[in-house]
């Protein structure tokens, strides 16, 4: 990780000094926990500001004004915990629920949320066990968790109620959309990623049901 990567990402995001300090603390926590728990791909850690933080922050622009978020399979808190840290000042009413089934990763999320003051609640549980508990969710997101058809199966109760889905994807975005349309009807667009020209954010809305 270079200082220029950090400075460039923070300048582009136009965050306050306090939010920058909280993101620095997140990065320090990630590096410390990475030595005992493989939270992210080891090769991506030197590029944490561009590969993970900037990649997560761009989701805020994909849902302007949204303050109730749900992040599934949070892992290292990407994107959910990063959004909760950045949203603390940018969107004072921001609340992000993070669902992670792995207890060790859940412990990382809980400790880091506490230290950074992130507007986050951690649920150490399987998605299927808790998805029905969430109401009033404006955006549900998940990164590097599952193919789109499975994501829609998990989040259908929310997406049918007006929640928007934001799912970062790589080159497979279009093929996963095609596969999902074999089962579901929905509206979708792919927002080009600002951090990877071969990737995009699949935005799903108006899910209306499974096809026969």
UniProtKB/Swiss-Prot annotation:
Pfam families on file: GidB (PF02527)
Reactions catalysed according to its record: guanosine(527) in 16S rRNA + S-adenosyl-L-methionine = N(7)-methylguanosine(527) in 16S rRNA + S-adenosyl-L-homocysteine
EC top class, as a word: transferase
EC numbers, comma separated: 2.1.1.170
Keywords: Cytoplasm, Methyltransferase, rRNA processing, S-adenosyl-L-methionine, Transferase
UniProt xrefs under InterPro entries: rRNA_ssu_MeTfrase_G, SAM-dependent_MTases_sf
Chain sites annotated for binding S-adenosyl-L-methionine: 73, 127-128, 143
Source taxon at top rank: Bacteria
Cross-referenced PANTHER family: S-ADENOSYL-L-METHIONINE-DEPENDENT METHYLTRANSFERASES SUPERFAMILY PROTEIN
Its job: Specifically methylates the N7 position of guanine in position 527 of 16S rRNA.
Record-given protein name: Ribosomal RNA small subunit methyltransferase G
